[in-house]
């Protein structure tokens, strides 16, 4: 007993081995079981449900993001093809417009040349007719002049 007094331990201390120690152990086990069944399991279930919910939402968000990226790529492809098609249509329209302009210009030139040629031929015809008429009138006048000169003599 002298050895125990030397370290300052007395009877009835913290680590006395008697019936209190097993009773405390049983209380700790019972408290652990009660806390586990009443508090930790429901909280754990709620945490697991929340983790599953978050995990499912993350997976769903990743899937939707993947789908959005795919749709964006498809739309960009469609936009590029639409732009190419629009450029092709504009180019064709410009070519058609140029072609129609050239055809209209050529037609107008041909009509102008035809009108000019027709007017030239008409002028030549009228000039020729006027010369013929003048020639006939000159013949008639010269005959008259000759007749008068002959008669006056």
From Swiss-Prot:
Compartments it resides in: Cellular thylakoid membrane
InterPro entries the UniProt entry points to: ATP_synth_b, ATP_synth_B-like_membr_sf, ATP_synth_b/b'su_bac/chlpt, ATP_synthase_B_chain
Pfam families per UniProt: ATP-synt_B
Major location category of this protein: membrane
Disulfide bonds: none
Transmembrane segments: 23-40
Keyword check for Thylakoid: yes
Alphabetic keyword roster: ATP synthesis, CF(0), Hydrogen ion transport, Ion transport, Membrane, Thylakoid, Transmembrane, Transmembrane helix, Transport
Membrane topology classification: Single-pass membrane protein
GO annotation, cellular component aspect: plasma membrane-derived thylakoid membrane; proton-transporting ATP synthase complex
MF-aspect GO terms: proton-transporting ATP synthase activity, rotational mechanism; proton-transporting ATPase activity, rotational mechanism
Task of the protein: F(1)F(0) ATP synthase produces ATP from ADP in the presence of a proton or sodium gradient. F-type ATPases consist of two structural domains, F(1) containing the extramembraneous catalytic core and F(0) containing the membrane proton channel, linked together by a central stalk and a peripheral stalk. During catalysis, ATP synthesis in the catalytic domain of F(1) is coupled via a rotary mechanism of the central stalk subunits to proton translocation.
The protein's assembly and partners: F-type ATPases have 2 components, F(1) - the catalytic core - and F(0) - the membrane proton channel. F(1) has five subunits: alpha(3), beta(3), gamma(1), delta(1), epsilon(1). F(0) has four main subunits: a(1), b(1), b'(1) and c(10-14). The alpha and beta chains form an alternating ring which encloses part of the gamma chain. F(1) is attached to F(0) by a central stalk formed by the gamma and epsilon chains, while a peripheral stalk is formed by the delta, b and b' chains.
Family: Belongs to the ATPase B chain family.
Protein name from the UniProt record: ATP synthase subunit b'
Annotated source species: Prochlorococcus marinus (strain MIT 9301)
Lineage, uppermost ranks: Bacteria, Bacillati, Cyanobacteriota, Cyanophyceae, Synechococcales
């Amino acid at each position: 007993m002298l050895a125990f007094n030397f370290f300052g331990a007395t009877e009835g201390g913290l680590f006395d081995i008697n019936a209190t120690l097993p009773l405390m152990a049983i209380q700790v086990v019972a408290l652990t079981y009660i806390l586990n069944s009443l508090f930790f399991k429901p909280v754990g279930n709620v945490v697991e449900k929340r983790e599953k919910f978050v995990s499912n939402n993350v997976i769903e968000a990743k899937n939707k993001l993947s789908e959005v990226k795919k749709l964006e790529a498809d739309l960009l492809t469609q936009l590029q093809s639409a732009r190419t098609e629009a450029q092709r249509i504009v180019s064709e329209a410009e070519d058609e417009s140029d072609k129609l302009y050239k055809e209209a210009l050529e037609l107008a030139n041909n009509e102008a040349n035809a009108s000019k040629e027709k007017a030239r031929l008409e002028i030549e015809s009228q000039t020729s007719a006027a010369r013929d008429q003048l020639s006939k009138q000159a013949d008639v006048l010269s005959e008259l002049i000759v007749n008068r000169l002959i008669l006056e003599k």
